[in-house]
Amino acid sequence: MNLSLINIGFGNVVSANRIISIVSPESAPIKRIITVARDNNKLVDATYGRRTRAVIITDSDHVVLSAVQPETVGQRVISNDEISDE
């Protein structure tokens, strides 16, 4: 198993193998997911007090908040996959 880490901003990283979804925090269902994760102590806030721009959902039901755009995080995952395929 190859460990690949994705930078989600401010020196924070998430394991690319554990990511299920990267979404925008604007919709009501995502806001509910964040609230439930906070209540269940499964929320990781990696925004450093900045505005949340991406919500990363992992296979362990953890929810990670990032101040980086979802498109940027997605591109980092894709480019990391291409590097690991070589």
UniProtKB/Swiss-Prot annotation:
InterPro entries xref list: RemA-like
Pfam families assigned to the protein according to its UniProt record, in alphabetical order: RemA-like
NCBIfam families: MtxBflmRegRemA, PRK04323.1
Entry's family note: Belongs to the RemA family.
Family matches, as PANTHER family: REGULATORY PROTEIN SSL2874-RELATED, REGULATORY PROTEIN TM_1690-RELATED
Protein name as annotated: Putative regulatory protein OB1501
Species for this entry: Oceanobacillus iheyensis (strain DSM 14371 / CIP 107618 / JCM 11309 / KCTC 3954 / HTE831)
